[in-house]
């Protein structure tokens, strides 16, 4: 039997800060190959100068329902090691807890799923794992390209689980069946520079910029059945002017929108343009651009694998899970283009923090939950 605790210890001890792989895939291949999985490493690079990324695709079985498990082995930097009471890559165990960068996000989910596969043995249908080493940073040469590659190899998926932290206080109390979309924007408001003593010879862009900030900030709608209201938050207001006697020539505004399933990136862009056009900017010019590539919102229907997972959790815990769409973006947004997807993992209270840790009992419970679902869905 494969011990999820030992596998997690071994994974944490690989300092796989994006995009450094360390030995994470070696460990996974060593665990999966004896279970009958064919493991393939795929490296992607390019696209705007992004760094090369190693990815792992492992698959076993043919025909029947095809279950995909997705996750990432990369972790965020640990920061100042002096802020940790346990070294970030030592995987020390104390008082029923295991400490280390990636313990919660999300090497524990991977360790639990691989251990669950070892526990249940042979299954009907097909099981695949798509593991990237670039989820925490640019996410350009990771899951999105790996899934396109897998589809080109003939793989079609019926349901996917992402092992990201999804629970709030106990394993199974919450799963994420959707995510809000995210769009980053920039507005440059241009006026005319001048001396503050002669405002009639200048055109101060700050009042116009403030008008736009107030017009666009806050809720964009009232929410939907499964999503909270869409929200636009300004994050930067910069004029590049440290003096008090110069009216600046321009103001640079940056913002992010987290939006629900009532919007697409295209409709959101048009709405923002419409609000800008309605404002009196006192002859200042406003140029709006989208920064980077927006991620779309998605929602998986409560049927098929989603319904089976809910039933499995309810049977084990006595309570159906909360169906959440909260939180930030994840690689589930890429998987949603191929099949229904749910995030189901541990509580994530300490992810990205110093002294990141999980309870060993939670790791054991997640392993048991995954094993029960594998039997229910593919048994």
Label each residue range with its predicted role.
Residues 40, 68, 128-130, 287:
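A structural signal for isolated positions on well-ordered beta-strands in alpha/beta enzyme cores
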Residues 94-96, 116-129, 152-156, 216-225, ...:
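Phosphate-handling active-site elements
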Residues 66-128, 362-365:
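Active-site metal-coordination/substrate-binding segment of hydrolases
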Residues 165-170, 177, 183-379:
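Metal-dependent amide/peptide-bond hydrolase catalytic core
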């Amino acid at each position: 039997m494969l011990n999820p605790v030992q596998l997690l210890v071994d994974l944490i001890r690989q300092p796989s800060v994006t995009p450094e792989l360390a030995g994470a895939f070696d460990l996974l291949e060593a665990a999966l190959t004896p279970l009958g999985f064919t493991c393939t490493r795929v490296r992607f690079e390019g696209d705007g100068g992004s760094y090369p990324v190693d990815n792992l695709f492992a698959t076993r079985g043919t025909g029947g329902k095809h279950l995909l498990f997705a996750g990432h082995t990369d972790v965020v930097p640990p920061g100042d090691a002096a802020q940790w009471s346990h070294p970030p890559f030592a995987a020390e165990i104390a008082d029923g807890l295991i400490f280390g960068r990636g313990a919660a996000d999300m090497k524990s989910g991977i360790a639990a799923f691989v251990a669950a596969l070892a526990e249940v043995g042979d299954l009907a249908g097909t099981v695949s794992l798509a593991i990237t080493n670039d989820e925490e940073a640019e996410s350009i040469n990771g899951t999105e390209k790996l899934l396109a590659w897998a589809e080109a190899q003939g793989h079609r998926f019926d349901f996917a689980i992402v092992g990201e932290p999804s629970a709030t206080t106990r394993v199974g109390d919450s799963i994420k069946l959707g995510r809000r979309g995210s769009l980053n924007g920039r507005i440059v408001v241009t006026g005319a520079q001048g001396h503050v003593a002669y405002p009639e010879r200048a055109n101060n862009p700050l009042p116009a910029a403030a008008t736009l900030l107030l017009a666009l900030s806050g809720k964009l709608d009232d929410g939907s059945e499964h999503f909270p209201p869409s929200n636009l938050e300004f994050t930067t207001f910069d004029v590049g002017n440290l003096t008090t006697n110069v009216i600046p020539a321009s103001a640079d505004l940056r913002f992010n929108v987290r939006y629900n399933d009532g919007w697409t990136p295209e409709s959101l862009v048009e709405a923002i343009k419409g609000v800008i056009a309605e404002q009196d900017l006192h002859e200042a010019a406003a140029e709006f651009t989208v920064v980077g590539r927006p991620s779309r919102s998605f929602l998986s229907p409560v049927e098929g694998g989603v319904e089976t997972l809910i039933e499995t959790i309810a049977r084990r815990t006595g309570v159906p899970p909360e169906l959440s769409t909260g939180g930030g973006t994840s690689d589930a947004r890429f998987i949603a283009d191929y099949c229904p997807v749910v995030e189901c993992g541990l509580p994530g209270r300490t992810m990205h923090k110093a002294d990141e840790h999980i309870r060993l009992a939670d790791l054991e419970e997640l392993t048991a939950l995954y094993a029960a679902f594998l039997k229910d869905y593919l048994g």
